[in-house]
Structures are given as C-alpha cells and as structure tokens.
C-alpha cells in the first residue's frame, strides 16, 4: 500500500511541475485532445480538438468542430463546419461545407468554402468551390510545382512562397 501512495505522490508531483513549467494551457491541450483511430462521424457542435490517425473523420452537415483537427494520416470528409485543420491529412470539403483555416500537406479537394488555406506545392489541390485566400508553399525540390485543378471554383487571393527563386506555378 505504501508503494502505491508513493507512486501517486510522484504522479501528482510531476503534474504540478508540468503545470509550473508550461502553464495550465499545455496540460489542457493534452487533456482535451480527442484521439480518433477509427472511422468517426461528428454530427453536432463540438469544441474539442481532434487528433486523427490513419482513419476517416466525417463532419456531417449538422456537425461543427470549433476546435482544431490535427492529422497524422487519414482523411477528413467535411459536410458541415470546421474551425481549423493542421498537418498531414487528406481533406474533402464538400458542397455547403466551410473550413475557416486549413494547413495541410496532403491532397485537398474543395467543393465548399475555405476561408484560408496553406498547402505544400508537392500536393494537388482540386477546387470547384470558393477559396478566399490560398497560400502555396514551394519547398524548392525538383518537380515541386503546385498543381491546382480548377473545375468551376474561385480563388480570391493567391500567394506563392517560393524558397528557390523559381516560379512554382
């Protein structure tokens, strides 16, 4: 019993030290991020952050994620609204759907509305919807020119960040 009490005291001490070192927000981010490892559908308003790993997260037309979705492989199918998407995840933003801020390094398909998107030029973006601001990062590798397939969509503002001096588009 005494070993269990000592172990519990050690865990509490570590938690206190983490809070003192990084602040309450660091603990809150880790504690409030919901890990998704199998296909999941969100159909209501949700303020949690999601970490998606090698599966599909679907946000239905009644779904609204006000937090951030972090990708590590896998795919997001958005039919509703998502505040922010970051990292390595494929995105399918469907008709009537909205994404406020998209930072992705994998293929993007947009038929809805994206307020702001930043993507790596080694990926393909297919747009038949509306993108208010598109930022393209060209890493400067050979054959790293951006591919933007436009079916019937609009891009209001296009910004290209080129790290080699070459014209990436």
How should each PLM-predicted stretch be described?
Residues 1-3, 25, 84:
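Intrinsically disordered, low-complexity regions enriched in serine, threonine, proline
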